[in-house]
């Protein structure tokens, strides 16, 4: 029986809050389910919608001026969403509406609304780099790694890009300046800030409040365009979310990291924006070349990779005084693979205090072995390295999420050997350890190399889990 609650049965204040919000007297079930949400509901009810409408209009004028929509349409969409609960009777949908409205009323002003007020002066901090001098070296390095054979029968997943990306990029440039303690960028846009000749698509970001930011941005886009916006979570990418429109076109994505991880990520300051240190990005690029898919990307567009690598090589030459003379010493470090147990042993004693590194290709196996070691000093850098690291009894234990390329049966390809070395160097940088000699040898080991065909490769670790999503239009949250 779905009776209305007796006014004398429930506390009048809570009942009144829920009644005002729903625009009707709640049923007994609605009251009991929603009473613990009374505080959030009250915040939503007293929220000044007129000020919010004004902020969205200002965001539209500044970042989405080319989108054909009127001020009255924006206002109608906002007021319609904030009254949606009055026509909703499903408890699950009501909870979703309350949660998303709560995010808007408590965070939008500080996260996106602030972008409409006068910005602090930009501190010009660019250094002139002679990238041209590194282009030939980068091309030589990449040419020796351009060994993937493209299977023309292989069906490649299409990455459709929304026309709104350019608007969101404009917003993100300002967002990165205003929120540079909680959000940093990497990838092509960050390198563009060093070398304006770099081409970039969307802006790659790491931040500490990814979910909240993406929800606020999704609503901004919805209110301006009227389109249904969906946020998706991918299980095999740690703390990753992406915004897509109703036609599955990519708008922006983001990785979320803890503040303590953000604090140790090496970064540099350019024009009021923090970017991941290009040295760190170069190591990540070398690491990623162990992934067969990335080598296929290199084969399709070598010049794109060349521009990026030349920029990063010039940065490390200028910043660290790296001399490119071909002296490689013990790089890449010796790597022996146990294909049955899916563990690669890297001999590290020539460079580091730990004598070897056991690189696991299955994360669950590593987690189990760490438990058996009864060690509690492991470091988890989340999506920054996509791995945990532990040093115990002079042995490093870590996980490698990419494929391992083989140049012959049981023999690790030098591309993967360098990738494993780069993975270890990422740890050294994150923990303020010694890395510069090793970095110099690693980069020099990439010079004057012949192409070595790929014999085979290991499979990537299979990640369990299901896709999650937030569908604003349908009032569904699945995580």
From Swiss-Prot:
It is an enzyme of class 2 (transferase). Induction: Expressed in the early phase of the viral replicative cycle. Its EC number is 2.7.7.19. One of its GO terms (molecular function) is ATP binding. Ca(2+) 1 binds at residues 202, 204. It comes from the Viruses. The keyword Calcium applies. Ca(2+) 2 binds at residues 202, 204, 253. It holds the Pfam family Pox_polyA_pol_N. The keyword Metal-binding applies. GO terms for biological process: mRNA processing. The active site is at 202, 204. It catalyses: RNA(n) + ATP = RNA(n)-3'-adenine ribonucleotide + diphosphate. Keywords: ATP-binding, Calcium, Early protein, Metal-binding, mRNA processing, Nucleotide-binding, Transcription, Transferase. Polymerase that creates the 3'-poly(A) tail of mRNA's. Heterodimer of a large (catalytic) subunit and a small (regulatory) subunit. Belongs to the poxviridae poly(A) polymerase catalytic subunit family. This is Poly(A) polymerase catalytic subunit. The gene is OPG063.
